[in-house]
Amino acid sequence: MALMALDHTRDFFTIGPFDPRDVADPALFLTRWITHFCAPAFVLLSGLSAYLYGRGRGRAELSRFLLARGLWLILIEFTLINFAWGFDPSFYRGLGAGVIWVIGASMLVLAALIWLPRWPIAVIALGMIFGHNLVDGIRAEDLGAAGPLWRVLHDPGRIQITETFRIYTLYALIPWAGVMAAGCLLGPTMLQDPETRRRRLYQLGAAITAGFVLLRATNLYGDPAPWSMQATPLATILSFINTEKYPPSLLFLMMTLGPSLMLLAAFEHTRGWIAGGLATFGRVPFFYYVVHLYLIHALAIAAAFEMVGVLVARAPEIGLGLPGVYLAWLVVLALLYPLCRWFAGVKARRKEWWWSYL
């Protein structure tokens, strides 16, 4: 959650445009790269949460919950979230289908998958994750009337709705729905005794990470951009870990999910004020996500006004260097903590059914 705020703080506060696959500035690239772990972990844990919610409930009840929550998240993406990015109620530039959209859409897919036995779900989930790079060569612009659907499923980009209105898909459904289904399959492991659970998470995470290194080294499959030897060891490492997120390649998912599983095991019993603060954010992820976008955007406007006297959040000529971005990020976290702590307390005291959607 905290790393997600770093990525969005960088997006609003960095001077000039930034290509996330540009390794020319190692510090800026690594700042972006470390935040790659957020979306895969977020989607995986959403699937795990769905499994835990379904314990003691029938499949019909779980399916209804996933359908309702999925539609709710899609609605929030196209309203509150899109407004947070642009502060423009007309949405004249169009709408963006980001991570909240793909979590909601993946919940709709999972609402159907949970009616299947465990093994078919595993086959479908792994097929989505491991097999989707086989269709990288199919481009939406070559499919005619089916192009918009392919934009949603695998080839992110612009969907022109009318002459003046468009939707930008950023997160492709096929691989991300596979990750959510995999998170649901992880559920039984999380219910085992702590020692067994940690051991299996370490084993699974290490196996996935080792698989990433071996498969990436071959340059045979799993990412559209091969790595290559560079002039310096650092540049070579950056080339090796520079994998595709849009859509998330197999190697991108292995690179991020493997370490995430090991960190999940390592942090299970971590104590201290930092761990406590992160846990506070984690107790109210939906509230955190919505509020942090509004807060970062508002702070970016205030910073721009202070620097150049213009009420605009992002422009090529204004912004902060990387040290300033990290300082702004810490300010954002400090402001978010009391808000999330307050809301977590309110949510814990309220028992109405609709609180589960917040």
Regions found by a protein language model. Give the residues of each.
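Alpha-helical transmembrane segments and their immediate juxtamembrane cytosolic regions
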Residues: 1-358
